[in-house]
A protein has these predicted regions:
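Outer-membrane beta-barrel "beta-signal"
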Residues: 60, 129-141
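Surface-exposed extracellular loop regions of Gram-negative outer-membrane beta-barrel proteins
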Residues: 22-42, 112, 134-138
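Transmembrane beta-barrel strands of outer-membrane/channel proteins
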Residues: 37-41, 58, 74-78, 114-118
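C-terminal hydrophobic structural anchor segments
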Residues: 61-108
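Residue-level signature of outer-membrane beta-barrel architecture
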Residues: 27, 62-64, 104, 118, ...
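Sequence/structural signature of outer-membrane beta-barrel proteins
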Residues: 3-11, 41-48, 79-86, 119-124
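Residues that define the transmembrane beta-barrel architecture of outer-membrane proteins
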Residues: 17-21, 50-56, 94-98, 128-133
């Protein structure tokens, strides 16, 4: 059973058939440069309407940037979005994701990673951008 709201705010329930696929790759071009990419696709069918859901992205990582153990990273891509919907009123704007972060290795066991994420058109709504600040602390045991 699926419970969700459509673009018009109406609650929908019912069975859904989902076929999902994904691919990812990472290429270490040098000890200081890593490129990665991913893509996903899902076909959702509730036997009345059909939706295609896509996401994809590219990333660049610079290991040991500034100091051994640190990492500078950038990600650009599309948040999951509906395309090819047969449901009237479904938004068609693609929500893009831009991210930058810097992992600073404090010592062998603790790192702190500040970052910023900018998402354009979240929820596939035009002119509704979001900027998110992040701080992650990792403790390694």
């Amino acid at each position: 059973m699926l419970f969700r709201s459509n673009a018009n705010g109406a609650n929908l329930t019912g069975r859904v058939k989902a076929d999902g696929y994904g691919v990812s790759a990472s290429f270490k071009l040098s000890p200081q440069l890593i490129l990665n990419a991913f893509g996903t696709y899902a076909k959702l069918d509730n036997f009345v309407n059909r939706n295609d859901v896509w996401s994809y992205g590219l990333g660049v990582a610079l290991p040991d940037f500034g100091k051994k153990g640190n990492l500078l990273g950038f990600v650009v891509g599309a948040e999951p979005y509906v395309s090819g919907s047969t449901i009237a009123g479904t938004p068609t704007t693609t929500p893009f994701h831009f991210e930058g972060f810097y992992k600073y290795q404090l010592n062998d066991r603790i790192s702190v990673t500040p970052g910023v994420i900018w998402i354009t058109n979240p929820g596939q709504v035009n002119g509704n951008s979001a900027v998110i600040g992040t701080v992650r602390t990792t403790f390694t045991f």
